[in-house]
Amino acid sequence: NKNTPSPTIPDFSKNALVGDTVTFSDQDFSVQNGDGIKLTSITITVLPDPGAGTLTLGGQPLAADSVVKASALAGLRFQSLSQPSVTTTTFSFLPTFDNGTQAQQPTTVTLYLLTAANEAPIARNMDLSTYKNVAITGYFDAVDSEGDTLTFQLMDTPARGAVTLAEDGSAKFVYTPYENKTGKDSFTYVAIDSAGNTSSEAKVTIQINKPDTKVTYADMEGDPAHKASIRLAEEGIFVGSYLNGEYFFDPDRPVTRAEFLTMAMATVGMAPLEDVTTTGFTDDAAIPTWAKGAVSAAVMAGVIQGSRDDSGAPVFDASENITQGEATVMLDQLLNLSDVPLEVFSAQGSDAHWAGQAAANLAASGVIRVEETNSAALSTGLDRAQAAMLLDGALDVLSQREEDGWLPW
């Protein structure tokens, strides 16, 4: 399953104000995939653009093919010109290790010369969970005070699975456990801003559990909602169809208003009313019998209000495909979330979609991402995969509350 990767030193970036000196430390030259292997020296293969400045060691300019011992790297400097003709440059080197090997690919160091100070981003530790043989999609959690675009880099790889980073350098990643592995796994990452600042390392911890259900879906491998679909089955909230000895989740199937309401109520533990024959909505006859108890309980709790038809009468539209905005409002009410500042947790600030406040509340709670709070996303119909991920996030909120000693119902 696991191929032992060769030791390497990842590409990195540094910056300084124009005219200042870039300094280096041992931490900049940390060995990745080394398993105890240490760096002994580096061989400079490409020098920085002389129009930006000069790379020196002990005050003396370095030439191409110069060898710098690891013990001397703290004396490495890049002196910026006071009036550089270029403000971004690179140099490269080949690392040599104490096992006698040299890296197959050079490490590239990007140097940024700034006209104003720029703070490093902050990367946060993360805790995720999945099931045996189920890949999960995650998003690195980092912020930058200047709002710079961030890219991400692994510093330490996991032992029980593999991590695939997004090709576009975004925060998205996929963790795939090795076959039949369970238990705790972890890896570390850093965030790098567009000025070349690198955050401190943050740790992603992943718990790989054996699912408490026999349900496995034939149509969910590789789907970002795979883990969520298994969790809904495990929690007794929803199980897909069973045909010819296999379970199918139908991730692209639209979800109706009645379906999402009943699943969301089951998620938070809110019981439907019993022996309900009529809900009070004008379109009551179109509400499935199995949903009437849930609809009535939700109305009484203020979770739903329905809408008005052309004559002004209240209707629920039970069989209509629910939009992400409508689902967001339902879940916000069921979780009893506090309102958060729109300008912080909304992709559109004060000009948000009518469901923008609910979406911001869910984003602040980690149920959805801020990028999912815009009008376009909230106006689209919800499919089963999206519903599963919403409810999976809600279960995480409830689990955290249980740890904190507070339950919503």
Regions found by a protein language model. Give the residues of each.
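C-terminal edge beta-strand
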Residues: 1-3, 100-116, 127, 196-211
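Extracellular ectodomain surface segments
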Residues: 3-50, 118-155
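Extracellular/surface recognition and adhesion modules
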Residues: 44, 53-55, 76, 121, ...
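Low-complexity "stalk/linker" and mucin-like segments enriched in Ser/Thr/Pro/Ala/Gly
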Residues: 48-72, 155-170, 241
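Extracellular/luminal low-complexity segments enriched in Ser/Thr/Pro
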Residues: 75-86, 172-182, 249, 316-318, ...
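Exposed beta-strand face motif in extracellular beta-rich ectodomains
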Residues: 87-91, 183-187
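Conserved structural position at the C-terminal beta-strand
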Residues: 95-97, 191
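Feature responds to low-complexity, polar/acidic, surface-exposed segments characteristic
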Residues: 126-131, 207-226, 239-261, 265-293, ...
